[in-house]
């Protein structure tokens, strides 16, 4: 939005356009790098920390000595003496009640972080560029639905305000009071132990007022909740991107807005108020890739497109896939049908033969006359349905074994010799 409109309207204290226009500073077209903003914010935020440490004597203000081995107890130092519960209890160790912590904290920790100056300036440029895009500002939670324009620039007369009621009236005329009402609605008690440490209440962030000279503007705006006041010569990334997230709603005075080109320069001219500083440039000046690829310079270097398309055909087994077989051999369908019909015809013939044989056998068995003595017996039938003669018929059951005739023993009379 800001990049498409090079002129910015200046609004009066009544919330109407004053008729004056300001050229959009080049810093609002700088690349937006959330990664750099977050990195710089994280490191600069660490510089506000206050060193802390536990007492060097904590956990060691008792007399204790290890009992050594052979007592069937741990070798941790134990309090000496007797007559009290404390005697014999473990001491000093971090696993003991009343002992010191593991690796007691020291005040000589590396609390501060150094950040490159150019990197800090890059982060501020990114935060300023993001503050001119309504989508990013609204995604941060600012209520700017009725704000006439972004970036929002007002006349320098605002820098001379000394009363809060004048500041409130200005915000209402600029339709920015909805953002303050959001702050009022968000005021609540902090969760956690910060309540005990003089950080009881928390609230959302409101607009950031950026001015050039303080002629009373600080006193006018400082009592409105959520408002942050910044001098354009001392912009702070911690205020322009709270939490390391770009998209703060900023209200500029005219003189502060015009001073941005001198502070950060343009791509044609270096910054006059900073030594050896040039505005960061985009890695791609034109992000329309389709336009770049279709440009004659690129097309001239490319080879001609290959019109012929080679598609890989999935090979299927025609013996298993009928559709593929019919593609290769259309007569296969007729052959398969003829085979099925032939099999059905053969099956019918086989069934008829079996029925005829069974009928013939039944008629034969009815014509046979039974012999004498064999009226009660059923005719013996062979394997193929033929009758067996009585002579050839084998007796059923166990085989009869022929026994030898028993020899007679000679009597006593026979034993006597003849006289």
Curated annotation (Swiss-Prot):
| Citrulline found at | 300
Q: Show the ranges annotated as biased composition (Basic and acidic residues).
A: 364-379, 404-419
InterPro entries xref list = Ribos_uL4_C_dom, Ribosomal_uL4, Ribosomal_uL4_dom_sf, Ribosomal_uL4_euk/arc_CS, Ribosomal_uL4_euk/arch
Q: Name one GO biological process term.
A: cytoplasmic translation
- Residue list for modification N-acetylalanine: 2
One GO molecular-function annotation for this sequence?
structural constituent of ribosome
Q: Which residues carry this modification: N6-acetyllysine?
A: 14, 106, 259, 333, 353, 364
User: Which Pfam families does the record match to this protein?
Assistant: Ribos_L4_asso_C, Ribosomal_L4
Q: Does the keyword Magnesium apply?
A: no
Q: How is it modified after translation?
A: Citrullinated by PADI4.
Show the segment(s) annotated as Disordered: 364-419
Has keyword Cell inner membrane? no
Residues that bear Phosphothreonine: 266
The annotated regions of Basic residues compositional bias extend over 393-402
Functional summary from the UniProt entry: Component of the large ribosomal subunit. The ribosome is a large ribonucleoprotein complex responsible for the synthesis of proteins in the cell.
Q: Of which family is this protein a member?
A: Belongs to the universal ribosomal protein uL4 family.
Q: What protein is this chain from?
A: Large ribosomal subunit protein uL4
Q: Which organism is it from?
A: Mus musculus
- The gene for this chain is Rpl4
């Amino acid at each position: 939005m800001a990049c498409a409109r090079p002129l910015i309207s200046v609004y009066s204290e009544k919330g109407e356009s004053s008729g004056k226009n300001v050229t959009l500073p080049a810093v609002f077209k700088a690349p937006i790098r959330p990664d750099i903003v977050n990195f710089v914010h994280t490191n600069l935020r660490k510089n506000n920390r206050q060193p802390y440490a536990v007492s060097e004597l904590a956990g060691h203000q008792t007399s204790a000595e290890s009992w050594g081995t052979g007592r069937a107890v741990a070798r941790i130092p134990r309090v000496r003496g007797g007559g009290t519960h404390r005697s014999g209890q473990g001491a000093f160790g971090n696993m003991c009640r009343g002992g010191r912590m593991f690796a007691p904290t020291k005040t000589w920790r590396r609390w501060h972080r150094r950040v490159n100056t150019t990197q800090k300036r890059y982060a501020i440029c990114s935060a300023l560029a993001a503050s001119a895009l309504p989508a990013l500002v609204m995604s941060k939670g600012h209520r700017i639905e009725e704000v006439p324009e972004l970036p929002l620039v007002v006349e320098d007369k605002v820098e001379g305000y000394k009363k809060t009621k004048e500041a409130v009236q200005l915000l209402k005329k600029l339709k920015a009071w909805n953002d303050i009402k959001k702050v009022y609605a968000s005021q609540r008690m902090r969760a956690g132990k910060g309540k005990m440490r003089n950080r009881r209440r928390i609230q959302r962030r409101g607009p950031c007022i950026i001015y050039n000279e303080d002629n009373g503007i600080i006193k006018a705006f400082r009592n409105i909740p959520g408002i942050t006041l910044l001098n354009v010569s001392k912009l702070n990334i911690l205020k322009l991107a709270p939490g390391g997230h770009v998209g703060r709603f900023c209200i500029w005075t005219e003189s502060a807005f015009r001073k941005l080109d001198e502070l950060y320069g343009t791509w044609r001219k270096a910054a006059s108020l900073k030594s050896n500083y040039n505005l960061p440039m985009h890695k791609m000046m034109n992000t329309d890739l389709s336009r770049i690829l279709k440009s004659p310079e690129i097309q001239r270097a490319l080879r001609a497109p290959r019109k012929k398309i080679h598609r890989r055909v999935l090979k299927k087994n025609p013996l298993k896939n009928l559709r593929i077989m019919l593609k290769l051999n259309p007569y296969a369908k007729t052959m398969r049908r003829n085979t099925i019909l032939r099999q059905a015809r053969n099956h019918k013939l086989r069934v008829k033969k079996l029925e005829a044989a069974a009928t013939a056998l039944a008629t034969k068995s009815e014509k046979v006359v039974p012999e004498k003595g064999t009226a009660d017996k059923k005719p013996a039938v062979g394997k193929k349905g033929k009758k067996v003669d009585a002579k050839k018929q084998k007796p059923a059951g166990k085989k009869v074994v022929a026994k030898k005739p028993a020899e007679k023993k000679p009597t006593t009379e026979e034993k006597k010799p003849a006289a």
